[in-house]
């Protein structure tokens, strides 16, 4: 169908507003992978795109076969009349009438019968008044995104299967996971899996645990599965679905010089195994140098500080080289298995089954493992060997003698407010057995929490106490404080009055005078204050009294003098503005009040 066969009014009439809006936000399910230009070798193109996307044509064009737009779409997609095949992302800046558009041309898929990606004229009838360069090509092979209505979809249907076309179409998180997977496989000499792309793991079903991670994908709502869909769990490519009970699998040793950083938030309502063992490869670590790591008899009851403690005290013989991300909620079923226990450092466990995730008040379980080449000697100066006792720098001094200056924060507190005493060396170095698993785990968790967070707070508090001024002056009697204040200048007294109410009361009650005070001690000034500001001298007065000349005079033995609030030379000095008063009897030549006093004398 050529352009001349279209009706004239179709060239100028825009599409109805009730069909779809051009500036609608993208749905949450379409945020992972941008649409790309598919291979349109055939002339028929079933349109699977949702009708509410911002770059899709009206729904009537793809559904009604009797419409005029349907043949236009099919013929344009086949490349007969030069449809724009650019995969463009555009940004409409608000406030502009012409809608300035920024174009980002994405990857152009190859095809024998595809038209060139040059800028060509589009069809008025296909997309009506939509901008031509903003169009995207149809996607016949791309299935609509799963909205959470299906359960048990195989991962091979949703995960990428071809490495040539889909590797560059992954999201950023999936690309990073794919690179990490290939690097880990190269280091560990693993055989490459059949599917090079990582399998996306989503757990959003309300029910029992999944049967396997590599054979089942469960997608739920956008808010619950958006984070889990952004990362990959590559161990499911190699491992079979784990069964219930204890599973320990020997794997190749990790590469040297890598430290696992594991942050763990476990559910408080995790069930305990009947035999007291960990599920899914969570076996205890022999000769663990830190007491917080789970033993063969401990259950996954560890808090977030347990795996954080593994970060600050690593070991050279047990450093994993894989990258894993797991987002799941703790399994509440009483089936005797604990999902994703604390990972021992010697053998990375098998991937735990994805239990049902509840976004409500039941809590969730997050286990993030990141690898990085870090020397073990960085943390606490350890050499990374086994059976190392956890110690902190402390000086043992008798409580009778005062603490040495500058070393207050190194001392071990003896009072009840101090930290608890560290357990003996054998408790810190041995692995808790099945018989004393509960008590040892609780004690070690408390000690881990104190070691990780409380030690830092304690040292910081001691440093603050060391650097803060001592409050000895508040304990001194008042007559001693008055004697001390009498040796201070006006600035120091003013600062004390502004900072401490107790000092202010003492200065005003006892009339403490500064050493550089310029208040006149003559009683005439108290009886005859400044006529302009009505300021009288009071006890401990450090308030402002600006230069206010007084025309009143007083006959002194050395001549007639005039009452001045401040000396003329000190009027503009900062001291006068801060309350350094100069109320002296001065000669007429030294003050500005001489002329005014002469005029008042003639009256």
From Swiss-Prot:
Residues 347-356 have a biased composition (Pro residues). Gene3D superfamilies: 1.20.1280.50. Residues 20-54, 111-163, 235-301, 332-359, 396-442 are annotated as: Disordered. The keyword rRNA-binding does not apply. Residues 470-522 form the F-box domain. It comes from the Eukaryota. GO terms for cellular component: SCF ubiquitin ligase complex. GO terms for biological process: SCF-dependent proteasomal ubiquitin-dependent protein catabolic process. The keyword Repeat does not apply. SUPFAM superfamilies: F-box domain. Keywords: Phosphoprotein, Ubl conjugation, Ubl conjugation pathway. Disulfide bonds: none annotated. The modification Phosphoserine is found at residues 21, 67. Pathway: Protein modification; protein ubiquitination. The modification Phosphothreonine is found at residue 347. Phosphorylated by ATM in response to DNA damage, promoting ubiquitination and degradation by the SCF(FBXO31) complex. ATM-phosphorylated FBXO46 is ubiquitinated and degradaded by the SCF(FBXO31) complex in response to DNA damage. GO terms for molecular function: ubiquitin-like ligase-substrate adaptor activity. PANTHER family: F-BOX ONLY PROTEIN 34/46 FAMILY MEMBER, F-BOX ONLY PROTEIN 46. Substrate-recognition component of the SCF(FBXO46) protein ligase complex, which mediates the ubiquitination and degradation of target proteins. In absence of stress, the SCF(FBXO46) complex catalyzes ubiquitination and degradation of MTOR-phosphorylated FBXO31. Part of a SCF (SKP1-cullin-F-box) protein ligase complex SCF(FBXO46) composed of CUL1, SKP1, RBX1 and FBXO46. This is F-box only protein 46. It comes from Rattus norvegicus (Rat). The lineage of its organism: Eukaryota, Metazoa, Chordata, Craniata, Vertebrata. The gene is Fbxo46.
